[in-house]
């Protein structure tokens, strides 16, 4: 009996060929690519990736699926399976002695929705500590609600701290929505394919930890104005003066500022602290 999807691993296996081809087209897979696939499941996407790329490294936590994948791809030289938790795995340590599979330059994955945020941090890093070996691009099948937040624009009610942090590190675009019926079993939510292109040159936050703290505080109470949310970090009148210099209204809320404005505000606060010191 073939392995069945396990709820505890958040497994929903893609069965729609049209969506599969949209993912492959978005990833722009060519010879020369070395692909990381997270959660290959039954190998439906893996088969295509191994036919198009020079190398595919699949990370799977489910032991039963690993046994099936080893049998299925044992004759495929460009395929390597790593059994384990992607969040705990040190890819560089695991692959650095295998030049045919390292370094990896793209990610293509249908990931478990309940660990989307940790996986994004694993792949992109954080503002204060970006991935030192960024991927060329990352194509993910994720929950639609999260996808919308990733590429949301300033002024939108869903533009939040996650939007700012991810857009600081990467460009993000929606490729296509994916209905629940495209999976086995169907999830209780709608899904979407997104493409992230990590930025080769990051926005110049002088003090990245301060930037992260500022964004987190700014969005801590969405209904409040920034001058209230940030009062523990900076004097209210000083903040109003800084916002005015950035051509931002004193009544602005966190979602009103673009990523660039968040960077400039962070830098001005850092400069002010330096001058005070």
Where are the predicted features?
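Catalytic cores of RNA-modifying enzymes
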Residues: 1-216, 244, 255, 264, ...
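Short helix-coil junctions and helix-kink-helix linkers
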Residues: 231-233
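Active-site-proximal catalytic alpha-helix in oxidoreductases
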Residues: 220
């Amino acid at each position: 009996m073939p392995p069945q999807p396990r709820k505890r691993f958040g497994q929903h296996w893609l069965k729609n060929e049209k969506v599969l081809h949209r993912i492959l087209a978005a990833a722009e897979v060519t010879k020369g690519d070395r692909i990381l696939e997270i959660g290959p499941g039954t190998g439906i996407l893996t088969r295509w990736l191994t036919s198009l790329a020079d190398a595919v490294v699949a990370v799977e936590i489910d032991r039963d699926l690993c046994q099936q994948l080893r049998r299925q791809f044992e004759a495929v030289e460009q395929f390597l399976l790593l059994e384990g938790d992607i969040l705990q795995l040190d890819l560089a340590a695991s692959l650095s002695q295998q030049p045919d599979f390292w370094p990896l330059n793209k990610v293509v994955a249908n990931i478990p929705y309940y660990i989307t945020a940790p996986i994004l941090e694993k792949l992109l890093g954080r503002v204060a500590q970006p991935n030192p070996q960024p991927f060329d691009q990352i194509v993910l099948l994720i929950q639609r609600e999260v996808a919308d937040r990733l590429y949301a624009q300033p002024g939108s009610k869903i533009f939040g701290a996650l939007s700012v942090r991810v857009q600081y590190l990467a460009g993000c675009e929606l490729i296509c929505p994916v209905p629940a019926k495209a999976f086995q079993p169907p999830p209780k939510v709608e899904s979407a394919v997104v493409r992230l292109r990590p930025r080769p040159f990051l926005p110049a936050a002088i003090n990245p930890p301060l930037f992260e703290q500022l964004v987190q505080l700014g969005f801590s109470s969405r209904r409040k104005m920034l001058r209230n949310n940030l009062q523990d970090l900076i004097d209210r009148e000083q903040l109003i003066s800084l916002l005015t210099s950035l051509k931002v209204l004193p009544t602005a809320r966190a979602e009103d500022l673009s990523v660039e404005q968040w960077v400039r505000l962070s830098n001005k606060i850092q400069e002010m602290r330096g001058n005070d010191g």
